[in-house]
Design a protein with these regions (language model features):
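Metal-dependent phosphoester-hydrolase catalytic domains
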Residues: 28-38, 45-184
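His/acidic metal-ligating clusters that form di-metal
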Residues: 11-43
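A solvent-exposed, charged loop/short amphipathic helix patch at secondary-structure junctions
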Residues: 1-13, 54-62
């Protein structure tokens, strides 16, 4: 699919935007009290920061520039994408978290679309800026490889990746490790 309106329409049907807005509304009360607020998880949706002009012809984006709704909403409401704060260039550091090359699983069981390059960064940590919070680092945790067109490949990126011990990994996703300094 290369029709951006269709892509976004399917995305809106998922209720992710409603869930993100509910989180934002609830977190506003915490922010008023000076709390540190984080939003993290597998969103099953890429970031709009990774689908702009510089990546439109990479990773099977097929010329599309997509302002994915959930990430756009969070950023518009003041939240920071922690990985992109440290690694702002999605070409050099795409930060792919799916599909991870879990060596104990055959590639076709790790992929939704084995004929495509479906690598995406769909696991995130967002935070709301606070004078008592400083981001220190952002890393990917998991296999150094991914699945592309049904095949295992080793990533050739500048992403800092912490590989699993003994090359064992329990998931088809990689993790995101963000380190913050918190002032008291």
């Amino acid at each position: 699919i290369t029709d951006v309106n269709k892509i976004l329409a399917v995305c809106e049907e998922s209720d992710r935007l409603e869930s993100a807005q509910a989180f934002i509304n609830n977190a506003a009360k915490e922010l008023e009290q000076g709390a540190l607020v984080f939003f993290a998880g597998d969103l099953n949706e890429p970031s709009y920061l990774d689908w702009q002009a510089d990546t439109k012809d990479l990773f099977d984006h097929r010329g599309c520039i997509v302002n994915w709704g959930t990430s756009k909403l969070l950023v518009q409401r003041g939240y920071k994408d922690a990985y992109r704060v440290i690694h702002p260039d999605p070409v050099k550091c795409p930060g792919f978290t799916f599909p991870a090359d879990n060596k104990s699983v055959i590639p076709e069981n790790l992929s939704w679309a084995p004929e495509a390059d479906e690598r995406e960064r769909i696991d995130f940590v967002y935070y709301y800026p606070n004078k008592n919070l400083q981001i220190k680092s952002a890393q990917i945790v998991g296999p150094t490889g991914s699945i592309v067109r049904g095949q295992r490949i080793e990533e050739q990126t500048k992403d800092p990746i912490i590989p699993p011990v003994n090359n064992q990994w329990p998931s088809d996703h990689k993790g995101v490790l963000i380190t913050f300094y918190i002032k008291e």
